[in-house]
Amino acid sequence: MLGEKIKNLPEILPMSGASVKVPTFSWLKITGLDTVLGPEMKSTGEAMGHGPNFGTAYLKAMKGGNKKIPTKGTVFLSISNEFKVEIVDLANRLKKLGFKLIATKGTASHLRASEIDSEVIWRISDKKSPDILSIMREGNVNLIVNLPTGKRAATDGAQMRRLAVELGIPFITTITGAKAAIQSLEEGENDYLMPINKL
């Protein structure tokens, strides 16, 4: 197909730009299903994007899957201890992009120790106000990054993720997804178009 034998090809083939493929989900059609990803198949399709760099390709793929990463507004962070070291860098990058950060008490405390400001929002199970559900219903959060562990976190997270689906608020449940989304905001070109004959 390439006009050469495999043994004669270079180890790294010359490439132009980057391509990203993302799964698509029909969460709204599956009532009551927790939207956190696991080993079972929940994807109902996929979308692909191509661009001059990873960020642009990722943005295009997300658009193709009818998902939009916000470019401004408020990001809610609820991060398990396992990812608290990595989230410091990501939170700093979100701040530099102009986002306001709100977070659960534990996550906010960890960010504060690294001199990153965030507003504390109560966990749902704390039964105090304001909690994340009320903030979401008021339209005051644009993106949710929820990396949970533990039974209470899973229960809180399930309610929050379900409401996010119903309200159309983008949410991320993996550290890899969070890194990809932030990189796409840093280097992605939203209006980038490539002629199909250049692919």
Locations of the language-model features?
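ATP-dependent carboxylate/acyl-activation modules
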Residues: 1-172, 178-181, 188-199
